[in-house]
Amino acid sequence: TVTVAGEGSYTIDPTTGAVTFTPEKDFVGTAKGVTVQATATITNANGKTATITSDATYTPTVVPAVPTTSPATSKDIQGATQTGTPTFAGTTVQVNGEDKAITIKDNSYTLLDKDGNEVSTTPAYAEDGTTPIGTFTIDPATGQVTFTPTDKSYTGKVTPVKVQAESSNGIKVDTTYTPEIVPVTPTATPAETKDIQGATQTGKPEFKGGTVEVNGVEKTVPINEDVPATFDDGST
């Protein structure tokens, strides 16, 4: 075996002389090649023998064949679960007049965590890249990524998560999915009362759920009537 750093490795079948080149995954272009030597023994009419050798080179060329990618984004209101599916597309390359199709391997979709490890779930961070605000999970069969917020008070962009897929020729490519959280603020109408000196008075401010337009659709977050009203210091 002969290994050329940055290119790949060569093996030879000593019986047939066939050379096999196994390229490194990122190598493209024409390799430096290797020298192949054959030895033969000849015998002349007098019965004397001699050994002769002959050298030849083998030079492989690797044609680029990388899938294409497109990132995904989504936008929704505070507290909503969001999904996005980045696009991974195969390609076709022509080699020696023959079309060769490159496809995406089944069930090869995965997330990459902050350290570049392949994972099926990973924390989601605020735009600062350090504050955890939720989780990302992925469907390995479809590549759909789900963002589930845990800090429902956070609004703004979420740090993009890397999404990876592998092609049929063993090339791993990645792109991103970026959710954005739109703030929704409930509205309040103050209450006023008037009565005589010493009389107990009762008033009830009116609260309505916040409404915002997201991607052309009006969305409302209703007031949770199961949560009791309190004063601004939390007391009742």
Predicted features, each with a name:
Residues T73-T81, E192-Q201:
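Short, solvent-exposed loop/linker segments at the N-terminal edge
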Residues G29-I42, G156-S167:
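A short beta-strand micro-motif common to beta-rich folds, especially ectodomain repeats
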Residues P64-P71, P183-P190:
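Proline-enriched interdomain boundary motifs that mark the N-terminal boundary
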